[in-house]
Each structure stands twice: as structure tokens, then as C-alpha cells.
Amino acid sequence: MKIKIINRSHHPLPTYATSASAGMDLRASIEEPITLLPLERRLIPTGLFIELPVGYEAQIRPRSGLALRHGITLVNSPGTIDADYRGEIGIIMINLSNTPFTIADGERICQLVIARHEQAEWVLTDELADTERGAGGFGHTGKE
């Protein structure tokens, strides 16, 4: 799939790390380092603008290494970039650790995954088909 992209950062375009990778790492495009204090969140620019085909979205997901080693994740995860959005891709990062974390220019801060999606059409009804689970909610399917 070919996707139009504008790169206003001075970093290379995102690439897949392996032939089986689902996501590409995005990099911070900042003039000076940004320090996130514990529980602080900030919008981090990437310098990237994309034009997705209709029927696709770009999902923004945390990087597992940043989450495990530093407690850094994304506030709205996954974030969605719609096919009709043309603004800069910005990443809402949060520091869930108890120590400050500094983001450097060019640092890999998240993953971008391209995914196909459908738009639903609601069918108003008075009842739904029965299932084994029924209306069982949170934790209903067991602990194991």
C-alpha cells in the first residue's frame, strides 16, 4: 500500500524494523529536549503529515520498551488518525513513573499501525440474539 506523506522533520521516514512488523516507530521532532515530570502529559510533534486511503486508519500505540523501562505511555491508546485528517501527527505522551523522563529530538516515541476499518450502520431492534455469555460484564469470563 502506498501512502502520501509530508516529512517536515529532519529524521528519516518511519520504516518497519522487520519483514513481519505490524508497526513503524515514529520519532519526536522537537527543537530542544522535553522533560516529562511524573504524571505530566505533553503533546509531542513528529513533523509528519499523512494522507490515508478511505477505509483505513492509522493507530498510534505505545512502545513497549518505553513503558517497561521508564513508565512512558500514551494517554489515548490507541490513538486514531482518520483518513480525512491532514494535520501534523502529534503524540500525547504521559509519564506514569515517579521520576522525570526526558524526550530527545529523534527519539522513537510510539508505533504507527495502518489498519483497515468499516463504518457501522445501526439496525434499531427491541432484542438481541442470546449467547452463552449473555450480559455478563467485567471479569465475567473468569480469572484463569
Curated annotation (Swiss-Prot):
InterPro entries: dUTPase (IPR008181), dUTPase-like (IPR029054), dUTPase-like_sf (IPR036157), dUTPase_trimeric (IPR033704). GO terms for biological process: dUMP biosynthetic process; dUTP catabolic process. The keyword Disulfide bond does not apply. It comes from the Bacteria. Substrate binds at R63, S64, G65, N76, T80, I81, D82. Pathway: Pyrimidine metabolism; dUMP biosynthesis; dUMP from dCTP (dUTP route): step 2/2. GO terms for molecular function: dUTP diphosphatase activity; magnesium ion binding. Keywords: Hydrolase, Magnesium, Metal-binding, Nucleotide metabolism. It is an enzyme of class 3 (hydrolase). Gene3D superfamilies: 2.70.40.10. Its cofactor is Mg(2+). The keyword Protein biosynthesis does not apply. Its EC number is 3.6.1.23. It catalyses: dUTP + H2O = dUMP + diphosphate + H(+). It holds the Pfam family dUTPase. This enzyme is involved in nucleotide metabolism: it produces dUMP, the immediate precursor of thymidine nucleotides and it decreases the intracellular concentration of dUTP so that uracil cannot be incorporated into DNA. Belongs to the dUTPase family. HAMAP family: dUTPase_bact (MF_00116). This is Deoxyuridine 5'-triphosphate nucleotidohydrolase. It comes from Porphyromonas gingivalis (strain ATCC BAA-308 / W83). The gene is dut.
